[in-house]
UniProtKB/Swiss-Prot annotation:
This is PTS-dependent dihydroxyacetone kinase, ADP-binding subunit DhaL. NCBIfam families: dha_L_ycgS (TIGR02365). It is found in: Cytoplasm. Unlike the carbohydrate-specific transporters of the PTS, the complex DhaKML has no transport activity. GO terms for biological process: glycerol catabolic process. Its cofactor is Mg(2+). The keyword Kinase applies. ADP binds at residues 37-40, 78-79, 115, 124, 161, 174-176. The keyword ATP-binding applies. Pathway: Polyol metabolism; glycerol degradation. It comes from Lactococcus lactis subsp. lactis (strain IL1403) (Streptococcus lactis). Induction: Induced by dihydroxyacetone via the DhaQ-DhaS complex.
């Protein structure tokens, strides 16, 4: 279960993972997007960490709300609104429960509502849904996350910028799926 300290630790680890993989995320985004997913996420998480360092929080909900507001205002493209919506929904859920499955469910619902995407459309919904299922069946692991990331390459994009490529979107890993994998890998490191 998340606490104030473990939540901040999780976000710090996620930031490190994003910074380390900034170029790779943008490389993934190049063929099927604007090529800026890594730069956008790195900037957003850097700003998020700055915001967390200068704030005092009474609960996990307040942390998630700060993350949401920062990502929505600092991350360009679709990633800011999608991740921001997820963290905002998680902040509302965290008022009632800190159950990891419930938090991820809230985030997934918000992403689906914002992006109007379903499972199988080569979006971050695929990995959020798979991770939620794994949490609910006590089978969440880094290996399972990596399988979902790799499987995204075989999907036809029907949402977002990648959908403009049609069949040419097949064969490319979805960058939002990869960045979400980093989010969940680092969560597992903290709550395991």
């Amino acid at each position: 279960m998340l606490t104030i300290d473990t939540t901040i630790e999780w976000l710090g680890k996620f930031n490190e993972k994003i910074q380390e993989n900034k170029a790779y995320l943008s490389e993934l985004d190049g063929p099927i997007g604007d090529g800026d997913h890594g730069a956008n996420m790195a900037r957003g998480m850097s700003e998020t960490m700055k915001a967390l360092e200068v704030s005092n929080f009474g609960n996990v909900s307040e942390i998630f709300k700060k993350v949401a507001m920062t990502l929505m205002s600092k991350v360009g493209g679709a990633s800011g609104p999608l991740y921001g919506s997820a963290f905002l929904a998680m902040s509302k859920t965290a008022i009632e429960t800190l159950d990891t499955s419930e938090l991820i469910y809230a985030g997934l619902e918000a992403i689906q509502k914002r992006g109007k995407a379903q499972v199988g459309e080569k979006t971050m919904v695929d990995i959020w849904s798979a991770f939620l299922n794994d949490l609910q069946t006590d089978s969440a692991s880094k290996d399972n996350l990596e399988k979902v990331v790799k499987a995204s390459a075989g999907l036809l994009a029907t949402k977002g910028r990648a959908s403009y490529l049609g069949e040419r979107s097949i064969g490319h890993i979805d960058p939002g799926t990869q960045s979400s994998a980093y989010l969940f890998e680092t969560l597992l490191e903290v709550v395991a």
